[in-house]
Amino acid sequence: MAASTFFIPSVNVIGADSLTDAMNMMADYGFTRTLIVTDNMLTKLGMAGDVQKALEERNIFSVIYDGTQPNPTTENVAAGLKLLKENNCDSVISLGGGSPHDCAKGIALVAANGGDIRDYEGVDRSAKPQLPMIAINTTAGTASEMTRFCIITDEARHIKMAIVDKHVTPLLSVNDSSLMIGMPKSLTAATGMDALTHAIEAYVSIAATPITDACALKAVTMIAENLPLAVEDGSNAKAREAMAYAQFLAGMAFNNASLGYVHAMAHQLGGFYNLPHGVCNAVLLPHVQVFNSKVAAARLRDCAAAMGVNVTGKNDAEGAEACINAIRELAKKVDIPAGLRDLNVKEEDFAVLATNALKDACGFTNPIQATHEEIVAIYRAAM
């Protein structure tokens, strides 16, 4: 086995009502001026103001940038960076789900390295670490609060740029599940299926290790057991906390084993049509695994077992099929759209979507490499 490197924030605080402990840790870092990157909804809900007040009580000045869009753009990064510079901020705090986290990473990376966020598309393109960043998570989840992945939409090219860089790993991640109680059903379902995609893609990745395998399979089990409960009753504190841990485990898996064609293809849908990332992943996940089962059937059989399927007596191919069926059943149970047609994806766009998907860094670790025609066929099957 080749040597592997395991990336993770140096400190990670998880569990109900853990934000207060994390706030005290923030004060210990010695930051004096920080930029809070969030979205308009969390500002309206008062959550951003609560964080700002807690920082003020600890003698930390803060300014809020809440212009982050659901698929954060290069313009969002530039606007946040301008505010950071105007206020001489020495650190960044992200508050929200994957969008504020990714936007904050982009801001912090360019603040430290200069240039434009487009300069860092690809793998490890930066020269030095971003400004110190603390990520407060409110969804379960993208796991962006603890990864080296940063996804930014380049509106000029209609693509999502995959920035995979060890230098965008936050210093501290916070997963206070009490902040997730208010998530609506649709967001709970989409982000939960995103986490499942992280776990399964990491498990079948060519870069998987025993450590990422353990994280991935545990995440699959916890998501299969708890996502329907969290969607059915958002106030179920036990299910919310379980999902917070599950998405973090999935994050540890894919942050180090990387991903595959589900994400490579979903990024193109999000960039081209401005669609929700988690929903795109959920729709594509079973179809990509049908393609992957040609070489990863045994691994998919393991995932089926982790989802609670009895695979006794099933060979690898049968186990893989059982996994794919279980994914479809879970997606249906949490009301994920049946196909890309429901998202108004157009077949005439498949060629350009496939071309861009094959350039996405997430696809490099897929268990089998695809031709352009095969990617188009997967999109078509997902309609």
UniProtKB/Swiss-Prot annotation:
UniProt keyword annotations, A-Z: Iron, NAD, Oxidoreductase
Signal peptide: none
Coiled-coil intervals, chain numbering: none
CDD domains in UniProt: PDDH (cd08188)
Record's catalysed reaction(s): a primary alcohol + NAD(+) = an aldehyde + NADH + H(+); a secondary alcohol + NAD(+) = a ketone + NADH + H(+)
EC identifiers of the protein: 1.1.1.1
Keyword tRNA-binding (UniProt): no
Gene3D superfamilies on file: 3.40.50.1970, Dehydroquinate synthase-like - alpha domain
Cofactors, names only: Fe cation
Single GO MF annotation: metal ion binding
Entries under Pfam families matching the protein: ADH_Fe_C, Fe-ADH
Family: Belongs to the iron-containing alcohol dehydrogenase family.
Entries under PANTHER family matching the protein: ALCOHOL DEHYDROGENASE, ALCOHOL DEHYDROGENASE 4
Protein name: Probable alcohol dehydrogenase
Lineage, top ranks: Bacteria, Pseudomonadati, Pseudomonadota, Gammaproteobacteria, Enterobacterales
Gene name tied to this protein: yiaY
